[in-house]
UniProtKB/Swiss-Prot annotation:
Biased composition range(s): Low complexity: 163-178
Zn-finger region bounds: C2H2-type: 2-24, 30-52
Origin species: Elsinoe fawcettii
Gene that encodes the chain: TSF1
GO MF entry, a single one: DNA binding
Region (Disordered): 154-226
Protein name per its UniProtKB record: Transcription factor 1
Single biological process term from Gene Ontology: DNA-templated transcription
Amino acid sequence: MVFCTYCGHSFTRDEHLERHILTHTNVKPFKCFTCHMSFARRDLLQGHYTVHGRNQDQQEIPAANGMIPKSAGRTPIACSNCAKTKTKCDKKFPCSRCASRNLRCTLRPTLVSTKNAARMGLITPETIAQDIANGTLPPDQTVAAEKVPLPIAPTGHVEESSKSSSPSGSPTSISHNSTGSDAPPAPMFDQFNGCPTPPQGLSPTTPSGQGFNGPASFPGFDDYNQQIGKTSAEDCNLHFMLDWQQLQLPIGLDPMLQPDMLGDQDLNFDMGAMGLGTQMEPILSINPELTNNMPPPLITPIETPKFDRSSSDLDAFSSGLHDRQYSVVSNQSVDSHYQAPPQPDPVVVAQDGWNVFRCVPSVHPSACPSTARWNLEALESTLQNHDGRSKWRPEVDENLFDGSDQLAVMQIHESTRDKLLAITQGFLHKALEIHRGNEAAQTYAPSNFVLLPPTKVLEYFLRSYTNSFERFYPLTSKGSLDANELMFCYQDRASSLLILLMVAQGAMNVPSREARSLTGGLVETCRISLFDLIERNIVMASDHNVLHAALIFTELASWSGDKWQMDIAMGQRGMYAAMLRHSGVLDRTTYPPQGSFSDGQTNADHMWNLWIQQESRSRPVYSWAMVDQELALFHGASPLFSVTEFGIALPHNEELWRAKSAGEWTSLMGQRVSTTDSDATASPPSLRDLSRRFLDDEMDSAECFLNPMHLRLLLLPLQAMVGHYQQLMCCFSDSGSSRVKNKTVTASSTRCRLEEVQCLLQRWYNIAMDYLKEHSVCSVMQASLVLYHLISLNAVTDFVQIERLARRETFDGTYQSLVWTHKRCITDVGEAIFHCGQVISLIRSMPRSVRPPWWAASIYRVALVLWCDSLIDKDGSSSYGGKSGQTFAVDALPSDHPLIQRYLNKGEGTPRLSKRDGSTIGLDHGLTVLNHCAEIIDEGATSRFQEGIRGKLDRLMRT
């Protein structure tokens, strides 16, 4: 079975595929020997020969009784006079009845062309006759309605035509109408709806006896006929009978190309190659009417159009899609100038409507533009730019991929890329059809084929994916990512979705227009196809590749910076969590009976394969638990999963998971047997069992062999408890305020429970420090420490109240109200400042390209907590009122430093924040703190989410 690389359709025979390919490539193998026009089908060529009156053997084709040949797809019908009198017409030209009565024989347009003209608002002989009958058009104006002189004369006849043209013969500048739609403007060939639009102030004509028989009327044809001294009856130029839709375009020009692709200076407009010769040059001279009203496939200027592209910092991508200036240059002067007004990026416009990180007043969701269709059309426009995609090379920094724990990305084969392209074509067309709806068939031409980025670019994006995603959610086994192996499995559609989402994740951290359009479009495309795949086959809900793809989509869309994608990711997060829960993968599974490592290579391979299958079920489950925990933390919600649900065994160490062969895996297992008393092949405990041991303070037992992922997952129950008790504390009046002397028993007990959870957090931190004394720090461990400090920060702050204060919702303007609000927002200032400093220190210690996707959100939380604390004056009565002691950089010292311990225990010392140049800033000025945190965000990799967080801090500084 063979596949079409353009649409993905399958064929059983090669000749069927070869015939089908012609519908995509615009290749027309059948050529006319007379005018050298090409056709896609043989029957079209046979019909075309009737225009010349000679067949392919140069033999004359006899006309049937002098009838007019069927040219341009038109069947001869009765003339207008015979049709009105309902008299039989011999369909000659002129017919015998009109000739005998000395009447003017006029060919009557067909029913289809009349309807098309009426739909476009064109003037036809029937509409003129109707207007005369109704009295709306005097009879003496019919001639003017049938033929209107052009205001600009064709090239080569300027002096002659200037006498008969309209007084306003100077070229006028006509600009495109801008729309307020949030979606990107449709391609130029779509905006014309397949038909030319009459220019303003010009009444177009419909071909009649004095015109030409073609599909549409073009300005300048009638003047051209007058100047060359030919009447319609004498004119025998067969070029006016050509089917303009079958016009052979020069090599390199595709009528489906976007306008920005016409800027290729290598494009050759050879008039002779199109079978027009030099006779068409005066007609195709550039004038405002012709340029403004013809779709790009029919524009054949004397000189290649030159485009001046501009970009905007506000719109990193749409500048290449919207903000373009088209300057068409003719032989004499610039006849027309187009300048589209800059349109803001809808993703940037919708940032004020985020449902999270709301430190500034937000707008109503109905006022935010939808970006789903915009992302898809931006992706389609980018992938259709074949020349640009083949030449595009992202800025590759090889230093970003250095490291021993980096996954290897295997080279992508051409067959893999072709199969992925075929399936992607179907995914994209399905998504466009859904979002365009009925409008697609009316205002959009059939989508041209798209091309994926070059293989080297795809491999770079996959390497970026392994560098940013796999470090925190390790799901790829054997130490290498092989897209070829994924594509040729039993479920190629699920594998294609997984690879496309990997590419989108890798392109997320590349700050270029092409990469951002690739990320936004692929996320929406894969979201629709992923949901459709699960809906068609519910068994796929437990498939490893489907769970992996859904995890990447949820994580990618949640931190994309696109409001629409962030909202729908949070909504579908619950759906995927329920799907994961109901599939049964959370239940306890045990390893099958296994032999010893000394039973031979065959048994070792068998044990290794069984072990990989078990890990492949465990790792997606706990990766989902980690993603759910992160989203719940930053959205101020409770996690969807409870600890008691996780009965499946925890994952093993990363060294075992990334073993490249059974021998390497066996060797690593043997080392574990020699260092521990437990069985290395035994199943690890589940998260439920591990949490029980942690609460019982039994983590020092020899049976518990911890790794960074285990420590990371232990934070899940602690975060859930902190969130639960903080929610209860918010229900009491002025929780933590000293002015309330007689608190209720429930409030006091809740505060005690919260303090117990803080003790458990300290126990977790001690275990983590003991682990780091024996092992080197890794990305998962760094992220776990940041989450620990953020959870501890939640225990001493009310972040929802802090954001309300930033929006001026809980502040009446008095200092007393500000002090009360501050006490409600921050219950322990010293603990809050300590954890904020540690978060900044950990984020800065991470490489800028190897950071969790939520790192900017953590800096945002730190900025608002420190800003809130800077609003009030510190006095001597406060526990942390700046007592005697030296100043210290709270974000530059480890947690066990004596200065930090003295500050936490006795309140001595003045904490400050350090800068890259070694200087420090105080914490008593809110604008300085916000600006410092904004500079920290600028130090990281650029993304839409990072830019959105940076913009919110800027707006808060201006309020």
